[in-house]
Amino acid sequence: MALLQIAEPGLSAAPHQHRLAVGIDLGTTNSLVATVRSGAATVLPDEHGYHLLPSVVRYTEDGATEVGYAARAHQSDDPHNTVVSVKRFMGRGLSDLADAAATPYRFVDAPGMVRLVTRQGEKSPVEVSADILRALKARAESSLGGELTGAVITVPAYFDDAQRQATKDAARLAGLNVLRLLNEPTAAAIAYGLDNAAEGTYVVYDLGGGTFDVSILRLTRGVFEVLATSGDSALGGDDFDHRIYCWLLEKAGLSQLPDGDIRRLLTLARAAKEHLTDNTSARINTVLSDRQVIDLELSRDELAAITRTLVDKTLLPVRRALRDARISVDDVKGVVLVGGATRMPQVRRAVGDFFKRPPLTNLDPDQVVAIGAAMQANVLAGNKGEDDWLLLDVTPLSLGLETMGGLVEKIIPRNSTIPTARAQEFTTFKDGQTAMAVHVLQGERELVSDCRSLARFELRGIPPMVAGAARIRVTFQVDADGLLSVAAREQSSGVEASITIKPSYGLTDDQITQMLTDSLAHVKDDIAARKLREAVVDAESLIATTDAALKSDGDLLAPSELQAIDNAVAALRSAIAAQQTVAINAATARLNDATNDFASRRMDRNIRRALAGQKISDL
């Protein structure tokens, strides 16, 4: 699968020229940039030797922008202008932020996503993320000594279209050419799979600063296939910090605190959590703004106790992903840990107990995603040799269209590998129909009312035909970044309409989970409802066809035959009103039987009309 490079004659790149491409892990808590040098992926440090760049941006009084450690140092004393964990706000409206009141930020609900009020004016999450990406770009170009060809940027597997598009917009604002967006767990699989030549079924358990993702991957020689994904976009190391913060408040008998004190205690909570990775106890000592002294000791066992529910919460998506992939714990060959929060002993212990084996930790969990992204960037830039590998991601929910009767026709099933394109033909419902409304839906239920509406558009200019004669081909295409395009084309005339779906607001992981749970809980009811709707649609179509035939050719019938058909139509209308599937199907069959001879006579008449005035020799 080596990429072909095409250039103007005489201008092709020299065989030895190495294009500068990087992989960027745009994280909630920390971000990194990596590249491939001499065949090995490496994370690029800053001028002080630090590999991690805190994902923190501060807007100063003199109009400057601080990113990283310098900004993080002011979390406590300048909380309104120091933006932390901006990734949680990407592609999100104010109504999507359940914990908005718990943050020190002043939000403005704007179209598309929230904006944050700072001393330098309102800033969108895209602009804040662009400042982080700009700093990483500068670090890479300084370290590599040249301009970047492009970057592969990682995102959580559960990022929706709006969040992915926001990430692309941030990169564009930072002057980066996005080669591809890559799911974080998949990037980790690339790093582990290539370094260790791993084969088999693996679980990637990614617990970062603000998001949790789990992916089930089948790794075979040269092929990465994601069998299933799940996760929680509002669960990560920040939540563990908050549990320690709440423990501090309880132990110290505190309630309401100024923003500066909240930031100070959260910073100390994070430091204590990290200290307990390698130590059995951590002391938390500080003086609050009201001169109250905090001096407490937190043990590793106490930390495990107060965060046990958070660790257990990560195992719910793990079970869901295993079920979706149709595998058991015994089928898993190994577990890859990703994200700084997986350093916590209680997390590693819980994961090991669940999967009955110690997790893999031979790569730095903070760096593994950036390393995998760098490897992918190296391929897309054309630097990789012929020993390329294939990467397949999956769609988290089914995608489909509304059909007559309020039914959903699934075009791309859930957990389909992407990129993918699938097409299906539809037709018109009424005679002379010249337009068709295309309603794109997402979800697992059978009825439109139970699924999520993504977009609507119309296909106009369909040539007038009898019902069922037109052929409209609808194509769904999901690109490598998970963005959906839908096109509808009438085959005989070539008229076409399309839409690229970038929803203003996306689904949360909890909503996705609820949709999957509902589909399982209501599967019998949904099947019954679908059968009823299909029976009604078929019945109403038959009634409409019969009425039209009676108006044009009713003279072909004897009074008794006409009465029999009228009675059958009336019986079918009554069955439809009663909403009983069996009765509707039986009444439909009776009307079909009653009109069989009538249909034959109509066909004979139409043939005679078509042949009138023609000689056999002309045929």
Curated annotation (Swiss-Prot):
Entry superkingdom: Bacteria
The entry's keywords: ATP-binding, Chaperone, Nucleotide-binding
Record bears the keyword Acyltransferase: no
A Gene Ontology biological process term: iron-sulfur cluster assembly
Gene3D superfamilies for this protein: 1.20.1270.10, 3.30.420.40, Actin, Chain A, domain 4, Substrate Binding Domain Of DNAk, Chain A, domain 1
InterPro entries tied to this protein: ATPase_NBD, Heat_shock_70_CS, HscA_NBD, HSP70_C_sf, HSP70_peptide-bd_sf, Hsp_70_fam, ISC_FeS_clus_asmbl_HscA
Gene Ontology molecular function: ATP binding; ATP hydrolysis activity; ATP-dependent protein folding chaperone; unfolded protein binding
Entry keyword annotation includes Nucleotide-binding: yes
Disulfide bridges in this chain: none
Membership in a protein family: Belongs to the heat shock protein 70 family.
Function: Chaperone involved in the maturation of iron-sulfur cluster-containing proteins. Has a low intrinsic ATPase activity which is markedly stimulated by HscB.
NCBIfam families in the cross-refs: HscA, PRK05183.1
Identification of the protein by name: Chaperone protein HscA homolog
